[in-house]
Protein backbone atom coordinates (compact mmCIF):
# COMPACT_ATOMS: atom_id res chain seq x y z
CA UNK A 1 0.00 0.00 0.00
CA UNK A 2 1.44 3.35 -0.95
CA UNK A 3 1.87 6.15 1.57
CA UNK A 4 -0.92 8.41 0.23
CA UNK A 5 -3.55 5.67 0.46
CA UNK A 6 -2.33 4.73 3.92
CA UNK A 7 -2.58 8.33 5.16
CA UNK A 8 -6.05 8.72 3.60
CA UNK A 9 -7.28 5.67 5.52
CA UNK A 10 -6.40 7.09 8.89
CA UNK A 11 -7.40 10.51 10.14
CA UNK A 12 -5.47 12.43 12.78
CA UNK A 13 -8.03 11.44 15.44
CA UNK A 14 -7.26 7.77 14.73
CA UNK A 15 -3.54 8.29 15.20
CA UNK A 16 -3.64 10.43 18.35
CA UNK A 17 -5.41 8.75 21.28
CA UNK A 18 -8.10 10.83 23.00
CA UNK A 19 -9.00 10.49 26.69
CA UNK A 20 -12.27 8.71 27.48
CA UNK A 21 -12.78 10.60 30.73
CA UNK A 22 -14.64 13.90 30.81
CA UNK A 23 -15.44 16.72 33.18
CA UNK A 24 -19.15 17.44 33.64
CA UNK A 25 -21.00 20.61 34.59
CA UNK A 26 -23.85 19.41 36.82
CA UNK A 27 -26.70 21.11 38.66
CA UNK A 28 -27.82 20.06 42.12
CA UNK A 29 -31.52 19.14 42.03
CA UNK A 30 -32.04 20.34 45.61
CA UNK A 31 -30.45 23.81 45.67
CA UNK A 32 -29.72 24.56 41.98
CA UNK A 33 -25.97 25.01 42.55
CA UNK A 34 -23.82 24.33 39.47
CA UNK A 35 -20.40 22.76 39.83
CA UNK A 36 -17.90 20.86 37.71
CA UNK A 37 -17.14 17.24 38.59
CA UNK A 38 -14.95 14.52 37.09
CA UNK A 39 -16.89 11.81 35.25
CA UNK A 40 -14.61 9.05 36.60
CA UNK A 41 -14.61 10.23 40.21
CA UNK A 42 -13.17 7.67 42.63
CA UNK A 43 -14.72 9.28 45.72
CA UNK A 44 -18.24 10.41 46.53
CA UNK A 45 -18.88 13.95 45.24
CA UNK A 46 -21.16 16.20 47.28
CA UNK A 47 -22.75 19.59 46.56
CA UNK A 48 -20.71 22.46 48.00
CA UNK A 49 -23.86 24.27 49.17
CA UNK A 50 -26.32 21.70 50.54
CA UNK A 51 -24.19 18.54 50.86
CA UNK A 52 -26.36 16.34 48.61
CA UNK A 53 -24.50 13.47 46.91
CA UNK A 54 -24.00 14.30 43.22
CA UNK A 55 -21.92 11.28 42.12
CA UNK A 56 -20.86 7.92 43.54
CA UNK A 57 -17.87 5.86 42.40
CA UNK A 58 -18.60 2.53 40.69
CA UNK A 59 -15.09 1.26 39.93
CA UNK A 60 -14.94 2.98 36.53
CA UNK A 61 -17.21 5.82 35.58
CA UNK A 62 -19.00 7.53 38.43
CA UNK A 63 -22.77 7.11 38.78
CA UNK A 64 -24.18 10.62 38.32
CA UNK A 65 -27.15 11.21 40.63
CA UNK A 66 -28.09 14.69 39.41
CA UNK A 67 -28.78 16.67 36.24
CA UNK A 68 -25.91 16.97 33.73
CA UNK A 69 -25.89 20.47 32.20
CA UNK A 70 -22.86 20.11 29.90
CA UNK A 71 -20.03 17.74 28.99
CA UNK A 72 -16.76 19.67 28.91
CA UNK A 73 -14.04 18.75 26.41
From Swiss-Prot:
Q: Does the keyword Ribosomal protein apply?
A: yes
Gene3D superfamilies with a match to the protein in the record: Zn-binding ribosomal proteins
The UniProt record gives the binding positions of Zn(2+) as 28, 31, 47, 50
Cofactor binding: number and manner? Binds 1 zinc ion per subunit.
Q: Name one GO molecular function term.
A: zinc ion binding
State the PROSITE patterns in the record.
RIBOSOMAL_S27E
GO cellular component entries = ribonucleoprotein complex; ribosome
Q: Where are the zinc-finger regions (C4-type) in this chain?
A: 28-50
Cysteines joined through disulfide linkages? none
One Pfam annotation reads Ribosomal_S27e
Keyword Nucleus belongs to the record:
no
Keyword tags? Metal-binding, Ribonucleoprotein, Ribosomal protein, Zinc, Zinc-finger
Can you cite a GO biological process for this protein? translation
Cofactor(s) it depends on: Zn(2+)
Q: Which PANTHER family does the annotation name?
A: 40S RIBOSOMAL PROTEIN S27 (PTHR11594)
Concerning NCBIfam families, the annotation shows:
PRK00415.1
Homology family = Belongs to the eukaryotic ribosomal protein eS27 family.
Quote the subunit structure annotation.
Part of the 30S ribosomal subunit.
The name this protein carries in UniProt is: Small ribosomal subunit protein eS27
Originating organism:
Methanopyrus kandleri (strain AV19 / DSM 6324 / JCM 9639 / NBRC 100938)
Amino acid sequence: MDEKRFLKRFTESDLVPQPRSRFLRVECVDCGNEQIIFGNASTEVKCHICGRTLAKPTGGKAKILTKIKEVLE
